[in-house]
Amino acid sequence: IERVRTAWGVTIRDGFGQTETTCQIGNTPGQPVVPGSVGRPLPGYRVELVDHDDQPASEGEIVLPLSHRPLGLMQGYANNAKATADAMRNGYYHTSDVALRRDDGYFVYIGRTDDVFKSSDYRLSPFELESVLIEHEAIAEAAVVPSSDPLRLSVPKAFVTVRQGYEAGPELARAVFLFSREKLAPYKRIRRLQFSELPKTISGKIRRVELRRLELERTPQPARLPGEYWEEDFA
């Protein structure tokens, strides 16, 4: 945000929304922009967070109470009553996205409910780890998924593509692991890395589900794959 403001004199204002809801949360003009936050609920939207039992939580799934139905919320999915019922249940519209709410009312996006995973009993957000990785000058894109581990049950593994002018290999892998160590808490560090093209949807979104499936299918872990490196290799 600061780099864009310095270079071009404009302010990036992150927000959160869906096709089903339009924009629900945003860093609007007139309030401070908090880096790393998607902002506060927009006028006309009552946004709440709930746990797995649909109980109020400070960190959990983003939901919209149907008792305060906003004008921007869809009526339902066309010709798909089951999908509509799944999304609109227990008095809420469920987004399947996870966030935490700060004391000042700003929301911090964590990730999709099916992307968040546990490592050593800590809940990890792929979105947060990927955001750190792409700050490295050599990384063009990144996708983080859980990789099976006998000690921690799972550890963060990053699939990354490299920017033009950089060469994928052990030296770059070492540099990325060091970068991860400097930027992330020990339990969040990238422990495994693979240089690879990333599967995407027709709209260009990374299909983490395919990468997760690849990791599950190779459990228990065999020898290193081509282009794959583990942090312990550089100890």
Regions from the PLM with identified roles:
Residues 144, 192-195:
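Hydrophobic/anchoring residues in structured secondary elements
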Residues 1-15, 19-106, 112-116, 129-130:
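Conserved AMP-binding/adenylate-forming
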Residues 79, 89-90, 135, 213, ...:
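Phosphate-coordinating loops and pocket residues in cytosolic domains that bind phosphorylated ligands
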